[in-house]
Amino acid sequence: MGDFGYSFEGYDPTRHVRASLREKQISHKHAREISLHIRGMTVEKARDFLQAVIEKKRAVPFRRFKRQVGHRSDPGVMAGRYPEKSAAEFIKLLDNLESNAEYKGMDLDRLTIVGAVAHKGILIKRFIPRAMGRSTPKNNVLTHVELVAREA
């Protein structure tokens, strides 16, 4: 595995804490929409929101990837979905972020997410054999997610 950096600029090791997921099999589109929504939340509020998404009580608003996505009755959400697998991975990432903050001696109740970014990872190419000697490509895009929090 290669050497990974962070896309967050202005990182101060005394004020910020960060965590990342690398090469996970989750949708990069779902990860982007979740990242956009939890940025600015406290860690506890983000965890409660993601738990509600897994229980299908609150929808993640889709702002960019919203074609053919149904409307939801949540306030402030026009088009939205319930990406359970991505939300579960984000909860694990929040646990990692809290562990890193605890190691640094930060107050966990005052952590606010200031950077949440999702990137496309590597492409895994596979092929499905079809009739008459043809084959259909089946590509799988892995995802990188980065979280940065600041003690407010």
From Swiss-Prot:
GO terms for biological process: cytoplasmic translation. GO terms for molecular function: rRNA binding; structural constituent of ribosome. Gene3D superfamilies: Ribosomal protein L22/L17 (3.90.470.10). Signal peptide: none annotated. SUPFAM superfamilies: Ribosomal protein L22 (SSF54843). Keywords: Ribonucleoprotein, Ribosomal protein, RNA-binding, rRNA-binding. It comes from the Archaea. One of its GO terms (cellular component) is cytosolic large ribosomal subunit. Pfam families: Ribosomal_L22. The keyword Transmembrane helix does not apply. InterPro entries: Ribosomal_uL22, Ribosomal_uL22_euk/arc, Ribosomal_uL22_sf. Belongs to the universal ribosomal protein uL22 family. This protein binds specifically to 23S rRNA. It makes multiple contacts with different domains of the 23S rRNA in the assembled 50S subunit and ribosome. Part of the 50S ribosomal subunit. This is Large ribosomal subunit protein uL22. It comes from Cenarchaeum symbiosum (strain A). The gene is rpl22.
